[in-house]
């Protein structure tokens, strides 16, 4: 036995013979300190269960039209707005391919060798192999048994994971051993925890007893997850926790006697985080979704939903994806609603099918049991106010410049809304070819059979068939600084009406052929803006962009024509430079109009950012427009249209202004106006204010608009943020909607409480309470208000937990 002093050069000991160790285990090599990492990562997954399968709310939104399915067999990732649920960390660092040939390095203040059989290390003892390290006050390594035994301030590290305890024993190559009373830290997540003991059974299996995990500071853990025992199997990528409890400020808020969880990103069956909230129509609302991973391309989510004012609702969503097809089926059913004493239900079917190259079929069917269903059960304002659900199926074909659509489209319309026309069927074809010898050519042909249910008063509106063909040809001439585009369009339409009992004398056949000629032109001038540049200290370029648009269409009386899908467009920039002020194909306005517009912009010369835009436009009608949406004017008047003006200003950092006005020079009054201002000095600081005004007109809508709204997100303290919105209708003297809430960001968790009240379509106001706690690096519980906050507070940014800053050198070994 010889004694050696610490040498400036580390000594490399021969590796033990591989004997009967499997090749796979030999390739893994090294110390099993890395096994601690999936252990604690598993703890981070316990509360979320099969977290990777679903996002946001588990309750489906039975919307009118929705994309069917993400084009990937893998479950969709959690959206950014859901916050940091269970962290998706990389797997432990790749092991050296050296395997059993990897050298073992030792270092200490004093080393005592045993005839090449082993070594005893004292004082800053360290053993390193294949990326892992064991350190301690004293360490003994037996080369024959390949066993390392460490005592006193033992530290095991690998791939950013550090475990500290009083004692550890490991068979290095076999990855067998234990560590007593370990405290562990994770550089990637900032998480930490402790256990009574960790046993490493082999390279894949380990057991932790009385283990805990938190991303809070170990000295001040607001929350932590604990379990009596956790069994991990890295080969099967599954873990089982026994007696798991989530504690928040010392209070248990979630628990389970035993459950399994995944150790990687693969989907696995299990419970998803519960959703909780309160609504004035539903009472206390609790949903506990359960995810079933049927196959890589199929899954099922079952979501029982308990509402104290309604009862127990059962819902489900089935998703599938195959070669050339995908879709989802969703349904929910509430037997014997406590308030209505009736069964309430909703379902949705979406399917996409590829039939051949360029040929696809689709199905989109949505229905609810009654008119009040969206008001009573949907969680969002947009879904609560939805009054029309689509039932549609069709076939599409795309080939080069040609597209074709054949579909049947029906609607379920909820009262008090009136029914819409249904297309049973519609056949539509389009051909679009650009730069055909310098010409742009477009041809659209359509056949539609229109049907409509009786109105609420029992009136039968006109029904019939419509066929049209609309070819157009244009010749764009584009040069540097200017363009001219002449265009000719023909609209040929044929109607075959059904005799209606309400209007037996109405003519049944109509036809119309009308040409439209237009000429669009514009120029762009640029110059430097030295005065503005000196004022703001930035080099600016100013543009001046005049535009002239002329359109001519002869008059044709269309007062007897039906209105299947046509409405009057709102007067604005999109309409004033268009060939037809009506959307749809049932009205073609007579035109002899010239529109002039002028736009000026200020653009940063170095960055190209537009800081200012001002636009003004007006149209002159040489003869007056006789064709109206509901008839024909006998004596139209020539003259100028309303004057349109708008501006967008972002000249000062953090300040934004958008404003527009529609001014009638004849009556000297404003028919429409809006202004919106926003102050955003920095992240999570925003104040918005807006005002809208519209004078009622017989052309568009007799409903006046006179509304203002304010919204804001602003810090109250260093960690607390207030969110609010208020919208009021001055014309009706009533509140439109209001929202108030508080977000609190601690080191390792975020809390949100939000109250929303809005006017629904039928029975006054609806109020909802959202309460959510988000545990950094673990999961979140409660109802998610983030989408509502983004929708109602422009510029809103979710707060996130503010952990103590760390670096890659923290816990560095």
Swiss-Prot record:
GO cellular component: cell outer membrane; transporter complex
GO biological process: Gram-negative-bacterium-type cell outer membrane assembly; lipopolysaccharide transport
Compartments, as annotated in UniProt: Cell outer membrane
Keyword entries, A-Z: Cell outer membrane, Membrane, Signal
Region feature Disordered, mapped onto this chain: 1-29
Subunit structure as annotated in this protein's UniProt entry: Component of the lipopolysaccharide transport and assembly complex. Interacts with LptE and LptA.
Family membership: Belongs to the LptD family.
Name the record gives this protein: LPS-assembly protein LptD
Species per Swiss-Prot/TrEMBL record: Cupriavidus necator (strain ATCC 17699 / DSM 428 / KCTC 22496 / NCIMB 10442 / H16 / Stanier 337)
